[in-house]
Regions:
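Phosphoinositide-binding peripheral membrane targeting modules
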Residues: 24-65, 76
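N-terminal topogenic membrane-targeting module
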Residues: 10-24, 33-34
């Protein structure tokens, strides 16, 4: 992602999104229904994409009693890890991804 990419318009026609903590948490996950790709947008520019066909497992890994990370797996490999988020937000994103 380039420095000024945020200025480019992005088509949201075929995109569903989940903001687990609202806009204040600043993280969200999108699903492009046409390309069947999940894209995570985190804080400080963290971003990764995983095709739905490659996604084999979703794990909410607890870091402490209140916070966790969401990990997306393709086979044995972890292909994406979210920011450190409240466990409830991770569970919301996991359930949202599983509905597709």
């Amino acid at each position: 992602m380039g420095f000024l990419d945020f200025l480019k318009p992005r088509s949201k026609e075929n995109v569903e999104s989940c903001w687990p903590g609202g806009k204040m948490l600043q993280v969200h996950i999108e699903y492009n229904t046409q390309e069947t790709v999940f894209t995570y947008f985190g804080r400080y520019g963290l971003q990764f994409s995983v095709p739905k066909s490659n996604l084999t497992n979703i794990i909410v890994k607890e870091v402490n009693r209140t916070h966790s990370v969401l990990q997306l797996y393709s086979g044995e490999n972890c292909v994406g890890t979210s920011d450190l988020l409240p466990t409830e937000a991770c569970n919301i994103m996991k359930n949202w991804v599983l509905q597709y």
